[in-house]
A protein has these predicted regions:
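Nucleotide-activated chemistry modules centered on ATP-dependent adenylation/adenylyltransferase
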Residues: 1-202
Length: 202
């Protein structure tokens, strides 16, 4: 969604601050998208911050990551406000779609044109798009294609609990998988259990 969103809004602003929220920092399969965007859109600046889920992961030592019981928790709105203040950003744009979930559909339909929250200065240009529409837009504009984990699974970001994502990394980006396991050691157990079940089924 971020690929289409950036292309849609880039002609209308002098400067765009793109925020990539990472679960594991500096993964090569993510960096290639960031590099692509920075080269294609001269008015874009990329910053990287931890995904809001990372703070709760650290609080409980999720999947073996370094635990910090005193870790402060943040949500999406709080992180948005932090970035806005630091980079002097007036309007925030998001790739949320009504088709993503019931909650998003209900939220987006309360806004002007189903996608403009004038009070909070937040905008959702993809509100009425479906996944199919986003992929058609990307194809029509000749943009970089999103990763596909396999024939049935489109990328949904770095979901370290998704076995399809982990298998994708193991097959195509083994160095990235090492970085994931280094941060979240128990991820390796998920792969071990998957391989064990496959071996038993043979």
């Amino acid at each position: 969604d971020s690929i289409a969103l950036l292309d849609l809004i880039s002609p209308y602003f002098k400067e765009i601050v793109c925020v990539y929220m990472y679960v594991v920092k500096d993964l090569s399969h993510i960096n290639r998208y960031i590099n692509y965007a920075c080269n294609k859109y001269p008015n874009v600046k990329y910053i990287q911050i931890p995904h809001f889920s990372v703070y709760s992961f650290r609080r409980i030592g999720y999947l073996g990551c370094v635990e910090n019981e005193k870790q402060k928790l943040y949500n999406m709105a709080q992180l948005t406000d932090i970035v806005r203040e630091k980079y002097n950003v007036e309007w925030a744009f998001f790739g949320f779609k009504q088709s993503d979930s019931m909650n998003r559909r209900l939220m987006l339909r309360t806004y002007k044109l189903n996608g403009i929250n004038e009070v909070q200065k937040k905008c959702y240009p993809l509100s009425e798009y479906r996944n199919k529409d986003v992929l058609e837009y990307i194809s029509r504009k000749g943009l970089i294609k999103p990763e596909s984990y396999d024939l049935k699974h489109q990328s949904s970001g770095t979901d370290i609990t998704d076995i399809n994502y982990l298998l994708f990394l193991r097959g195509k980006f083994p160095e990235d998988l090492k970085k994931v396991i280094n941060e979240y050691p128990l991820v390796e157990r998920k792969l071990f259990e998957y391989d064990h079940e496959r071996a038993k089924a043979k």
